[in-house]
Curated annotation (Swiss-Prot):
GO terms for cellular component: nucleolus. Its main location: nucleus. This is ATP-dependent RNA helicase DHX33. Residues 78-246 form the Helicase ATP-binding domain. ATP binds at S91, E92, T93, G94, S95, G96, K97, T98. The keyword Nucleotide-binding applies. Its EC number is 3.6.4.13. GO terms for biological process: positive regulation of transcription by RNA polymerase I; ribosome biogenesis. It is an enzyme of class 3 (hydrolase). One of its GO terms (molecular function) is rRNA binding. The gene is ath. Disruption phenotype: Conditional RNAi-mediated knock-down in germline cells results in hypotrophy of the nucleolus. Keywords: ATP-binding, Helicase, Hydrolase, Nucleotide-binding, Nucleus, Ribosome biogenesis, RNA-binding.
């Protein structure tokens, strides 16, 4: 690689990186220059790579299991768990903890009086690991081994090992605070520190205490990670930690020598350099920030592979992000033919829990998309931020799972030195509204809950205020959850969406709101195609509503539900089949919950009533047009514009709008907007004050 472009380092760094000269010139310069680098051992890299390995023709599953480092520690693990109710396990890359520890416990008889539950922060990890463990036990998924994620339950009465997302277990705890269906809870990937995981830490501690108090069978808890602060967790759980050796290979780390503005360009150049100079069995994993960025780059790579004259047709691109269907996510794990290189574009979903075989090269953009909560205005803002040093090492380590590898960082060493050491826990930076409602549903006051790290006071005050306005709680000396609030927690949704569904019947549009909430939960239904932009725009135009994006999305989803051949219909209309199929499944389950709550499933074509209903749930997301063409949000007075993807962008600007979320890039945008009126605000949500003047 051109020494003017990349430098070697044993440490990590962060930042974007394109250059001002042409793609070919940069590409050739990199392809014809030597790469000089040191090889730090990946044992230095603090990360989690769970052993999800594909069975090879030469190696049996049993041989693979015995080759994992955790296998030789199985007796030690069981001995520790027998002596203690809680065990902390810190294991290096590739130890086998995620797949093997549940099996050790099953064979030791821990599933005789309850299930072994293993939480994962992401649905794709829960599904993938469950399938692997079922395969290792020579069973069918849903029998001895199953999984439960939001809107999907693949378990049976025979299930002994159950993988589930932390959000699912948290919701179960509302109905069963003692978690009586479980004999063991394994809290995996503890370092991720999601809000749900942090809540579960306190809930399992409380369940253990109450079981002992009531002289019930002890609940065993195993907390596993590769990068957790063992002292912090040990003090919290009042137990010691055990460390397991991992299995890693050397990874050479490259940083750009200069800072660049466009890391996408850097990623492209680096990928085709790798493709030209390394064996085809060296698969590539590229870390990006989100679905739109991933799909856009995937198109560019495919186009460049077609037109390049250097034999780059032997390259296959896959994508991996949360919104993908299960089938599409699992495609990444299927080996490609011997002469075809696999390139996977992924979000941080690929940092931990799942390991994709064959990865020898990692390209790290150095950014991650995060939601942050502004306690002043009570709004979530979605923006790309720098990753932490711990994340950088986790990403680099993905190149050293099967053999020696290389990590190319699209940022300088100096940039990386400025990164935070570890990722800030979600509970300190995200909207705590759902968390507060969940705890109140458990009759737990946030001020009395045993947090590993307590949320910010300003955030809690904002959450209580928001829930009070939604009618979910009553605040005062002793805040408590209302009957409406208890109904709201029945839906696995943001409280705003739950409120929408619970009040839709009174507006006469329950069926429409079921569809709208479902499609909003799936996100990104429109497919962009740079080769056929005009055709895609024409196809999308027929769904557009002059009222805004929410009704446009409703038109799309209704068309999808009515189509006799959904796959062909989506192809012809440049729409995302995976997202719409997911939305259809979500709608089915939300409708079942609504029926269980005895809500009237009425329907209406009254556009005004539908928009008023949406306002009733999104009253915190109101913005008012100013004379300079910007919008000011009613909460927080944030200056913003309508997002370019909106049907209202570049057209008539309504005086008053509501929006789904704020997206922050170089500018601040309001995404998914609908026109409303000041009269509706006064009629539907008269308690909303401080509406900005025009």
């Amino acid at each position: 690689m051109d020494s003017k472009y990349f430098a070697t380092s044993r440490n990590d760094a962060v930042g974007p990186s394109p250059v001002k000269f042409s793609f070919k010139r940069k590409y050739d310069a990199m392809a014809n220059s030597p790469i000089l680098e040191k090889k730090p051992h990946v044992a230095q890299i603090k990360q989690t790579i769970a052993p999800i390995l594909l069975t090879s023709k030469r190696t049996s599953i049993e041989q693979q299991q015995k080759s994992l480092p955790v296998f030789n520690c199985r007796h030690r693990i069981l001995k520790e768990l027998e002596a203690n109710d809680t065990v902390l396990i810190m294991s290096e890359t590739g130890s086998g903890k995620t797949t093997q520890i549940p099996q050790f416990l099953l064979l030791a008889g821990y599933a005789k009086n309850g299930m072994i539950g293993i939480t994962q922060p992401r649905r794709v990890a829960a599904i993938t690991v469950a399938r692997r463990v079922a395969q290792e036990l020579n069973g069918t998924i849903g029998d001895t081994v199953g999984y439960t994620v939001r809107f999907e339950d693949v378990t049976s009465r025979a299930t002994k090992i159950r993988f589930l997302t932390d959000g699912v277990l948290l919701r179960e705890s509302i109905k069963d605070r003692l978690l009586l269906k479980y004999s063991v809870i394994i809290l995996d990937e503890a370092h991720e520190r999601t809000v749900n995981a942090d809540l579960l830490f306190g809930i399992v501690k409380d369940a253990q205490k109450e079981r002992r108090k009531q002289k019930l069978a002890n609940l065993k808890v195993v907390v596993t990670s590769a990068t957790m602060d063992i002292d912090h967790f040990g003090n919290y759980f009042n137990c010691k930690g055990m460390y397991l050796e991992g299995r890693t290979y050397p990874v050479r780390v490259m940083h750009t020598k200069e800072e660049h503005e466009d890391y996408i360009h850097t990623v492209l150049v680096t990928l085709f350099h790798i493709h030209r100079t390394t064996p085809k069995n060296h698969d590539v994993l590229i870390f990006l920030t989100g679905q739109e960025e991933i799909e856009s780059l995937a198109q560019q790579i495919r186009q460049l592979a077609k037109i390049d004259t250097t034999g780059t047709t032997d390259l296959r691109v896959f994508t991996l992000y949360a919104q993908l269907s299960q089938g599409k996510q699992l495609e990444c794990f299927v080996p490609t033919p011997a002469n075809v290189r696999k390139v996977i574009l992924a979000t941080n979903i690929a940092e931990t829990s799942i390991t994709i075989p064959g990865i020898r090269c990692v390209i790290d953009c150095g950014f991650v998309k995060e939601k942050s909560f502004n306690t002043v205005d009570g709004l979530d803002v979605l923006k790309s931020v720098r990753i932490s040093k711990a994340q950088a090492w986790q990403r680099a380590g993905r190149a050293g799972r099967d053999a020696d590898g290389t990590c190319y960082r699209a940022y300088t060493k100096a940039e990386m030195d400025s990164f935070a050491d570890a990722t800030q826990p979600e509970i300190l930076r995200t909207n705590p509204t759902s968390m507060v409602l969940q705890l109140l549903a458990l009759d737990i006051d946030c001020n009395n809950f045993d947090f590993l790290d307590p949320p910010l006071e300003d955030g809690l005050r904002s959450a209580y205020k928001s829930l009070d306005a939604l009618g979910a709680i009553k605040t005062g000396d002793d805040s408590y959850i209302t009957p409406l609030g208890r109904q709201m927690v029945q839906y696995p949704l943001d409280p705003k969406y739950s409120k929408l569904l619970l009040t839709a019947s009174s507006f006469g549009c329950m069926e429409e709101i079921l569809s709208l909430v479902s499609v909003l939960s799936s996100d990104h239904v429109f497919v962009s195609n740079s080769e056929k932009n005009e055709m895609a725009a024409l196809a999308h135009a027929k769904f557009q509503s002059k009222h805004g994006d929410h009704l446009t999305l409703l038109n799309v989803f209704n068309g999808f539900l009515k189509s006799e051949k959904p796959k062909m219909w989506c192809h012809d209309n440049y729409l995302n089949l995976r997202s719409l199929t997911y939305a259809r499944n979500v709608r089915r389950q939300l409708r079942e919950i609504s029926e269980h709550l005895h809500l009237a499933l009425n329907s209406s074509d009254d556009i005004e009533m539908l928009k008023k209903c949406i306002l009733n749930g999104f009253f915190e997301n109101i913005a008012v047009l100013q004379r300079d063409g910007f919008y000011i949000t009613a909460s927080g007075n944030i200056r913003s514009k309508i997002h370019p993807s909106s049907v209202l962008h570049g057209k008539y600007k309504p005086s008053y709008i509501l929006f789904t979320e704020i997206v922050q890039t170089e500018q601040t945008f309001l995404r998914q907007v609908t026109e409303i009126s000041i009269e509706w605000i006064k009629e539907v949500v008269p308690f909303v004050k401080n509406i900005p003047t025009r």
